[in-house]
Swiss-Prot record:
<protein>
    <recommendedName>
        <fullName>Polymerase acidic protein</fullName>
        <ecNumber>3.1.-.-</ecNumber>
    </recommendedName>
</protein>
<keyword id="KW-0540">Nuclease</keyword>
<dbReference type="GO" id="GO:0003723">
    <property type="term" value="F:RNA binding"/>
</dbReference>
<dbReference type="GO" id="GO:0039657">
    <property type="term" value="P:symbiont-mediated suppression of host gene expression"/>
</dbReference>
<dbReference type="GO" id="GO:0039694">
    <property type="term" value="P:viral RNA genome replication"/>
</dbReference>
<dbReference type="Pfam" id="PF00603">
    <property type="entry name" value="Flu_PA"/>
</dbReference>
<comment type="similarity">
    <text>Belongs to the influenza viruses PA family.</text>
</comment>
<keyword id="KW-1048">Host nucleus</keyword>
<feature type="short sequence motif" description="Nuclear localization signal 1 (NLS1)">
    <location>
        <begin position="124"/>
        <end position="139"/>
    </location>
</feature>
<keyword id="KW-1190">Host gene expression shutoff by virus</keyword>
<dbReference type="GO" id="GO:0004519">
    <property type="term" value="F:endonuclease activity"/>
</dbReference>
<dbReference type="GO" id="GO:0039523">
    <property type="term" value="P:symbiont-mediated suppression of host mRNA transcription via inhibition of RNA polymerase II activity"/>
</dbReference>
<keyword id="KW-0597">Phosphoprotein</keyword>
<comment type="function">
    <text>Plays an essential role in viral RNA transcription and replication by forming the heterotrimeric polymerase complex together with PB1 and PB2 subunits. The complex transcribes viral mRNAs by using a unique mechanism called cap-snatching. It consists in the hijacking and cleavage of host capped pre-mRNAs. These short capped RNAs are then used as primers for viral mRNAs. The PB2 subunit is responsible for the binding of the 5' cap of cellular pre-mRNAs which are subsequently cleaved after 10-13 nucleotides by the PA subunit that carries the endonuclease activity.</text>
</comment>
<comment type="subunit">
    <text>Influenza RNA polymerase is composed of three subunits: PB1, PB2 and PA. Interacts (via C-terminus) with PB1 (via N-terminus).</text>
</comment>
<keyword id="KW-1262">Eukaryotic host gene expression shutoff by virus</keyword>
<feature type="short sequence motif" description="Nuclear localization signal 2 (NLS2)">
    <location>
        <begin position="184"/>
        <end position="247"/>
    </location>
</feature>
Length: 716
């Protein structure tokens, strides 16, 4: 049979059939009859389409190939024979441009004259039996069915045969010829008997015995046996009256489906109140680094040694004083804590040998800042059962905060390029197995786009701080250990660089459970004057600690250097995720990869190189009040990375809730944009669920603001 197929059919058809069988994991050496059936079906689809065009008046005409007018528009779009991804891309494109309803199964053709999809069937059995099987499977009035048999019979939806008699006769003649050729070689009987109907796996799969009894017991209420339930499900029209279907499902459900129109959605209400404040565990755009290039000092790589070396590069220290107090804290204690750090670092330098770690003296200011002896005594619940007025602490509702412009500025800054390289190529992971060439190429292109990005600096900074803090929490549980906040990078010229952002002092850390909290005081250098945006620094006490000489094109200038001090806390589980912030690189790489895949499936070739090297093309980055923002592919990479990094830095229950609930509204809006006529019930409840997550988190408030911009432009 295989030899016959290769002789009888056009090589292009044979190649397409081979691809189709390979895609479904079938062996054409074994399933030879199926191979012949696929080739026959492909040929009929192509013959159905051949010579049929639409002229300028919109009339269907038949034109032979050597006719000079063959540049007219083809009447039929051929979907059969394409790989699945490409076929669905074509179907979606047709639906978007013509407004046709999207079919559930891939059809074979689209008729531009009649504006309908066509399912072609070629059967070795009775045409009416095969027609019913097809109709039962498709269950759609919008797909036209046309069945041909090898005996010259045909059947079509509503007896509408689409083509002229001569074109159909050509198909029937070809099928009859194939049958005769097969019969001459003794292949016809086997081929005729091998045809299976359009049954599904469930219809062939008989459930018996224990599994059958379990199936009968597991049915929803009001169904006596599996057959009844199957019949109900088979007859369940997805596009029917949803209210009726819901009431059929349960007596308790009483939902009224409202059509979702362009005028239906309203903007998400953002809370009023004082502006939101910075709540990340370390400074982002406002951080200042004291750096050493090409470090080669004794003990290089030991954090404390590196920190002291970095501190020595700055000569503008002065007597510190408070410029922005913390409203609720004992501010002199923060000032004394910094003075203590300076004094104890000086003590270390006076020693003969610098120690690897430094435990701070447990002074009153550090005990206060780290909450030592502040936790209420824990009492076993069983010992309290008899206390009549036993109750939980009264906890205040969190104060609502409004969106502030600083968080958008932080995000914009995270997307920018720095003049340093923050990840080496192997940060994403060496190839363990012989990975395909394309994957490595994509990774290298992506790394080149993000290695200088400020968001990548935040990743490396977060990984270092969380790793150091978790190590110290386990190794020195009772000590107030001094932990330098360090990062490492390379200059554009490739020189190594060690950076010091400030210090952390860790409190007592007997962390038994994942959520047990370790307190710490962070002290971070900055050139940002806190008086410019005092609301951003609500949780901080800010000191002025020195003057820094900055060199620029216009000469030297002196700027005050500040120290941002605050009490903070974290847990084992938060530190564990902080240590894994490199995952953000992987997540954003996968998002870029899905964009490349979509482009490649349309062009039917790998588009990685073009995607990254075509600098003139712009891509959508996000929504703003001005509309859809666009940028280069590098900007897209950095924006996606920054979003992933901020999701990690500002992780919170508010973000989890907002992401989950707003996604539902997003899907409905996208369905409306795709002309799918969505319906909703209890839309007010969905808005309530979204808005109860908008409390005081700056990143969530910014995302809600972006969502409102998206709604405005999506529904124009």
């Amino acid at each position: 049979m295989e030899d016959f197929v290769r002789q009888c059919f056009n090589p292009m058809i044979v190649e397409l059939a081979e691809k189709a069988m390979k895609e479904y994991g079938e062996d054409l050496k074994i399933e030879t009859n199926k191979f012949a059936a696929i080739c026959t079906h492909l040929e009929v689809c192509f013959m159905y389409s051949d010579f049929h065009f639409i002229n300028e008046q919109g009339e269907s005409i038949v034109v032979e190939l050597d006719d000079p007018n063959a540049l007219l528009k083809h009447r039929f779009e051929i979907i059969e024979g394409r790989d699945r991804t490409m076929a669905w891309t074509v179907v979606n494109s047709i639906c978007n441009t013509t407004g046709a309803e999207k079919p559930k199964f891939l059809p074979d053709l689209y008729d531009y004259k009649e504006n309908r999809f066509i399912e072609i069937g070629v059967t070795r059995r009775e045409v009416h039996i095969y027609y019913l099987e097809k109709a039962n499977k498709i269950k759609s009035e919008n797909t036209h069915i046309h069945i041909f048999s090898f005996t010259g019979e045909e059947m079509a939806t509503k007896a509408d045969y689409t083509l002229d008699e001569e074109s159909r006769a050509r198909i029937k003649t070809r099928l009859f010829t194939i049958r005769q050729e097969m019969a001459n070689r003794g292949l016809w009987d086997s081929f005729r008997q091998s045809e299976r109907g359009e049954e599904t796996i469930e219809e062939r799969f008989e459930i018996t015995g224990t599994m059958r009894r379990l199936a009968d017991q597991s049915l929803p209420p009001n169904f006596s046996c599996l057959e009844n339930f199957r019949a109900y499900v088979d007859g369940f029209e997805p596009n029917g009256c949803i209210e009726g279907k819901l009431s059929q499902m349960s007596k308790e459900v009483n939902a009224r489906i409202e059509p979702f129109l362009k005028t239906t959605p309203r903007p998400i209400r953002l809370p009023d109140g004082p502006p939101c404040f910075q709540r990340s565990k370390f400074l982002l755009m406002d951080a200042l680094k004291l750096s050493i290039e090409d470090p080669s000092h004794e003990g290089e790589g030991i954090p404390l040694y590196d920190a002291i070396k970095c501190m020595r590069t700055f000569f503008g220290w002065k007597e510190p004083y408070i410029v922005k107090p913390h409203e609720k804290g004992i501010n002199p204690n923060y000032l004394l804590s910094w003075k203590q750090v300076l004094a104890e670092l000086q003590d270390i330098e006076n020693e003969e040998k610098i120690p690897r770690t430094k435990n701070m003296k447990k002074t009153s200011q550090l005990k206060w800042a780290l909450g030592e002896n502040m936790a209420p005594e824990k009492v076993d619940f069983d010992n309290c059962r008899d206390i009549s007025d036993l109750k939980q602490y009264d906890s205040d509702e969190p104060e609502l905060r409004s969106l502030s412009s600083w968080i958008q500025n932080e995000f914009n800054k995270a997307c920018e390029l720095t003049d340093s390289i923050w990840i080496e190529l192997d940060e994403i992971g060496e190839d363990v197995a012989p990975i395909e060439y394309i994957a490595s190429m994509r990774r290298n292109y992506f790394t080149a786009e993000v290695s200088h990005c400020r968001a990548t600096e935040y990743i490396m900074k977060g990984v270092y701080i969380n790793t150091a803090l978790l190590n110290a929490s386990c190794a020195a549980m009772d000590d107030f250990q001094l932990i330098p906040m360090i990062s490492k990078c390379r200059t554009k010229e490739g020189r190594r660089k060690t950076n010091l952002y400030g210090f952390i002092i860790k409190g007592r850390s007997h962390l038994r459970n994942d959520t047990d909290v370790v307190n710490f005081v962070s002290m971070e250098f900055s050139l940002t004057d806190p008086r410019l945006e005092p609301h951003k620094w609500e949780k901080y006490c800010v000191l002025e600690i020195g003057d820094m000489i900055l060199r620029s094109a216009i000469g030297q200038m002196s700027r005050p250097m500040f120290l941002y001090v605050r009490t903070n806390g974290t847990s084992k589980i938060k530190m564990k995720w902080g240590m894994e912030m490199r995952r953000c690189l992987l997540q954003s790489l996968q998002q870029i990869e899905s964009m490349i895949e979509a482009e490649s499936s349309v062009k039917e070739k790998d588009m990685t190189k073009e995607f990254f090297e075509n600098k003139s093309e712009t891509w959508p980055i996000g929504e703003s009040p001005k509309g859809v923002e666009e940028g280069s592919i590098g900007k897209v990479c950095r924006t996606l990375l920054a979003k992933s990094v901020f999701n990690s830095l500002y992780a919170s229950p508010q973000l989890e809730g907002f992401s989950a609930e707003s996604r539902k509204l997003l899907l409905v809006v996208q369905a409306l944009r795709d002309n799918l006529e969505p319906g909703t019930f209890d839309l007010g409840g969905l808005y309530e669920a979204i808005e109860e997550c908008l409390i005081n988190d700056p990143w969530v408030l910014l995302n809600a603001s972006w969502f409102n911009s998206f709604l405005t432009h999506a529904l124009r």
